Design a protein with these regions (language model features):
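Short helix-loop "hinge" at the ATP-lid/N-box region of the Bergerat-fold HATPase_c
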Residues: 145-146
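Short beta-strand/loop element within the Bergerat-fold HATPase_c
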Residues: 152-164
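Short conserved segment of the HATPase_c
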Residues: 177-190
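Short alpha-helical Gxxx[C/S/T] motif in the catalytic ATP-binding
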Residues: 203, 207
Length: 239
């Protein structure tokens, strides 16, 4: 009897996993098809004989941007698949929190400057973990804050270490997160109601997987009067 129950539970688990896989494949196909459709349209426009040089350069720039988005999508999906498969071995090395935050944000400095946004980093102490993977996790969260903060806004990151954990708090003075989106923002392929057409809904999901894979936690909440706040903790022992 117990064997029958166990087999039934395994069958139900397999059925759920197959359904999840089918949904994921459908989501991935849709995510890739959207920019590919735009690329096809751009190629058609580039073939017009009366195209001015200025217009051609504009279309080529848009084409490169779309190709970069597809490249980022595929790279991120491959990282997620590696984490899903359990093939990632996170390093355990002592890393300065200041070094971690600066490296996490380095690719975002120019986009922030173009938006007139201010980035403030206050960090003290260290954490034990994998520097490259954790940079990826934090960079995705900061990028999300940047995209939801108006021009001239501010993003502030505070990091400190205590006897129990190393904590990183990322705050912005942007639009915040709608109450209905808040419980779902770390879910794979979830797009909030205020997300633009460029969002794939996987950056924050990847961040959570990387942080959780190192025994850490991440939560999001709204600030008063405006803005969002992400709190990351890497624990020094089992919690």
């Amino acid at each position: 009897y117990k064997m029958t129950i166990r087999l039934r539970e395994q069958q139900q688990t397999l059925t759920r996993e197959k359904a999840h896989l089918a949904d994921s494949i459908a989501d991935i196909s849709h995510q890739i098809r959207t920019p590919l459709t735009s690329i096809n349209l751009l190629i058609g426009l580039l073939s017009e004989p009366k195209l001015t040089d200025a217009r051609r350069q504009q279309l080529i720039h848009a084409l490169y941007e779309l190709l970069s988005r597809i490249d980022w999508l595929i790279t991120t999906l491959l990282k997620i698949s590696r984490l899903d498969a359990g093939t990632v071995q996170f390093k355990q090395e002592q890393v300065s929190l200041e070094e971690l935050l600066k490296k996490s944000c380095v690719t975002l400095l120019i986009p922030m400057e173009l938006r007139g946004q201010e980035l403030l980093i206050h960090a003290d102490g260290a954490f034990r973990g994998d520097l490259p993977w954790t940079c990826e996790a934090i960079g995705n969260i900061v990028k999300n804050c940047m995209e939801h903060t108006p021009e001239g806004g501010r993003i502030e990151i505070d990091a400190a270490e205590n006897a129990l954990y190393s904590e990183i708090i990322i705050k912005d003075n942007g639009t915040g997160i709608s109450p209905e989106d808040l419980p779902h923002i770390f879910e794979r392929f979830y797009k909030g109601k205020d997300s633009d057409g460029k969002s794939f809904g996987i950056g924050l999901a990847l961040s959570r997987m990387i942080i959780a894979g190192q025994g850490g936690t991440v939560k999001a909440e709204n600030r008063k009067p405006v803005g969002a706040m992400f709190t990351i903790r890497f624990y020094k022992g089992t919690v």
